[in-house]
Amino acid sequence: MKTTYVNATIVTMNEQNEVIENGYIIVENDQIIDVKSGEFANDFEVDEVIDMKGKWVLPGLVNTHTHVVMSLLRGIGDDMLLQPWLETRIWPLESQFTPELAVASTELGLLEMVKSGTTSFSDMFNPIGVDQDAIMETVSRSGMRAAVSRTLFSFGTKDDEKKAIEEAEKYVKRYYNESGMLTTMVAPHSPYTCSTELLEECARIAVENQTMVHIHLSETEREVRDIEAQYGKRPVEYAASCGLFKRPTVIAHGVVLNENERAFLAEHDVRVAHNPNSNLKLGSGIANVKAMLEAGMKVGIATDSVASNNNLDMFEEMRIATLLQKGIHQDATALPVETALTLATKGAAEVIGMKQTGSLEVGKCADFITIDPSNKPHLQPADEVLSHLVYAASGKDISDVIINGKRVVWNGECKTLDEERIIFEASRYKRGLQR
């Protein structure tokens, strides 16, 4: 099946960050086979031609760190620092989860993400009360591209920890698929919730199965102080001593990194999932993304969960990411629009090991989203496309979402998830949680 999308303004995010006015994209099954400017002559003998009527077409956004199973917890635990938020709000509520509630919560997060332009994401879920196979089936049904990872903790007894490691290894062996729509990573929660032995076992699993690692690291000053007091090392050095960086690793946050740590992480191919809104809301601080990029680190933007954000809008994350860097450095050139877009598309895709997506180029997967600026005053005049995408647009502006060549959202309607049912069930399950 060959389909051509014509009469579009195409934000390619190729090496030149080329924007093609009045262009077209030809998709064959799940791949892009041509991207050009001008009128379409049907040289490829396509099956269908779709007039985009001047819509902006850009790569699907890539969320490098989130927790979709937590989506029912939106608005619970506002105005709290990370540790009391986790210990007195999030973990007690997660302990009440059931498989049915977890699926309902996941569906809500998936619906919000895909309708706001996210096509790929990397996720960590707490396995308490969760049917991991049901979660993977739910993500698959959404049509999204994802790395969904089972989180490990050292809570409970040593036998509990051993069982958690065994279950996580089975999960990795079952779901790791480097080139598929769904895959997984090895995901120890953090250095303050995992024992040294557990972190070492996670490193072993990652090396033996050739997977990536996903971990919360250097998120707060308190974490750095506590880990240094307990182990005599800062979190980066401690994680390295456990062997975690033997495989490409995504660290969520990286708010508290010094110059030497940034250089070390760049050298060891450790990438950062930057969560600006979540870090601000939890009072964790502001990650120095400008310095990370200058050190050669790979960085991708992320939302974290709705419980700490409180939405999954990647456009909002792009905007706050660039504004924060300009503000803390007092440098208006810090993180310009092209870089912000890169960190939410092809750069983010590279961070989570999904190089097959993130730009609109021949050979890439057909993952793209559209915005119709014609009826949106906040996107007019419509000639400064890149600027408007970062500084003016929002996830609410999305018209269409194509993932792997399939129309997942069309004219604002999600084709893979039942929006009315999901919203109804989210409210019903939320009422059953005891605060």
Swiss-Prot record:
Pfam families hit by this protein: Amidohydro_1
Highest taxon listed in the record's lineage: Bacteria
Catalyses which reaction(s): S-adenosyl-L-homocysteine + H2O + H(+) = S-inosyl-L-homocysteine + NH4(+); S-methyl-5'-thioadenosine + H2O + H(+) = S-methyl-5'-thioinosine + NH4(+)
Gene Ontology MF terms: 5'-methylthioadenosine deaminase activity; metal ion binding; S-adenosylhomocysteine deaminase activity
EC number: 3.5.4.28, 3.5.4.31
The keyword Amino-acid biosynthesis is annotated on this UniProt entry: no
Cofactor note: Binds 1 zinc ion per subunit.
Binding of substrate, residues: E94, R150, H189, E219, D304
EC category name: hydrolase
Keywords associated with the record: Hydrolase, Metal-binding, Zinc
Cofactors that this protein relies on: Zn(2+)
Positions contributing to Zn(2+) binding: H65, H67, H216, D304
UniProt family annotation: Belongs to the metallo-dependent hydrolases superfamily. MTA/SAH deaminase family.
HAMAP family (alphabetical): MTA_SAH_deamin
Cited function: Catalyzes the deamination of 5-methylthioadenosine and S-adenosyl-L-homocysteine into 5-methylthioinosine and S-inosyl-L-homocysteine, respectively. Is also able to deaminate adenosine.
Protein name: 5-methylthioadenosine/S-adenosylhomocysteine deaminase
Gene name as annotated: mtaD
